[in-house]
Amino acid sequence: MRLLRASVFLAFLFTLAAHAEKPWPIRAVIVTTFETGNDTGDAPGEFQFWVEREHLDQVLPFPGGVHPLRTNKDHTMLGMVSGTTLVNATASMMALGLDPRFDLTHAYILINGIAGIDPHIGSIGSAAWARYVIGDVAREIDPREAPKDWPYGIFPTSAKQPNPPSIEDPVWHRSNLFTLNQSLVQWAYDQTRSLKLPDDPAVAAFRAEYTNFPAAQRPPFVLLGDTFASDYYWHGTIMTTYAEDWVKLWTHGKGVFATTEMEDSGFLNAIDRLDEMKRVDRNRVLVLRTGSNYSMERPGHDAVESVSAPYVGRNLALESAYLVGSTVVHNLVTNWSTTRDHIPGS
C-alpha cells in the first residue's frame, strides 16, 4: 500500500513538473505533408532532407498528429509531417499550435512541399513562393449537364456560372482566400531568386516536350506564384484553365496560379485561428511549393495518361524545396537577435 501511494505521489510530481516546464521558444517550424518509409536513410519524402541536413535528431511524440515531431538539439527548429489532404493539414496544424510544449509566438512557419506546377508559369524543379493561398469551396455540376458555352462545371457558391466578373469571399466559410505577408514573401524571394537549382538530364528531356510553353522548358528557377489547394487531385488542360481563372477571381486579379496541392488552405485556416488565439503570428508564415509534375498533359498526349504517369521530377522537386526553403530559414534563425522582433521586409 505504501509503495502504491509512493508511486501515485511520484506520478503526481512528474505531472506537475511537466506542466511547469517552460515551453521551448521555437524559431522556425518546418511543415511537410508526407514521408515515405523512414525519416532518414531511404528514399526521401518531403521531411527527410530536413531531418538529415538540419539534424532534427530528437523525436517527440505527437498525439494529435499523424507522425512524430522532430527537433534539433537546441530546440529552436521544429519539424512536422502533417499528413496529406485538407483535413489532415488543418487538424495537424491546430494540434501543433495548441501544444503546450512549444512557444510559437515568434516562430516563422515554412510550409514546404512538392506540387503540380502550371506549365504556363514554371517548370519541373522550380520553386514558387506564394503570396496567396486559394481554397476550393465551390459548386459543381457534371460538365455534360452544363450549358454548352461553359468552359467547365465548377463555379463559386454565390454565382450561377463559372468565372463571374467578380466575387466576395463569404465570411462564413473563411476558406477560399488567404493573403500572406507580402513583404515577407518578397524578402524570401529576393533571398533566393538567384539560387542555381538542381537539374537532371531526364527531366530536361521531358520538359522539352512541352512545346509552346517557354516557362515549362526552362531549367528550374525560383519564382513568385500562388498556390491552389484542393482535395480533388485534378489534372489536365481544362482543369488548369479552371485553376488559373479561380486564382485570378479570388485574388481580384492580383494573383497568378502557379502550383496545385492538397493542404495549404487547411494550414492557413488553422493558422488564422491560432493567430486569433495568440498562439502564432500569421505574419510569419511562408509557403514554398516546388514542381514535381505539370498540372496538364504535354502536347500530343492525353490527360489520363499524364495524370497516371510517374513523377519524373519528384526527387528534383524535393531537392529544390530543401535548398530554397533552408536558405531562408537559415537567414531567419541565424539573425535571431533581429528577426525575433522584426519581421524581414516590413
Describe the residue ranges of each PLM region.
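Positively charged n-region of N-terminal signal peptides that target proteins for export
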Residues: 1-5
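Bacterial N-terminal signal peptides
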Residues: 7-15
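Bacterial Sec-dependent signal peptides at the C-terminal "C-region" and cleavage site
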Residues: 14-22
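Accessory terminal and edge-of-domain segments that mediate assembly/interaction
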Residues: 21-346
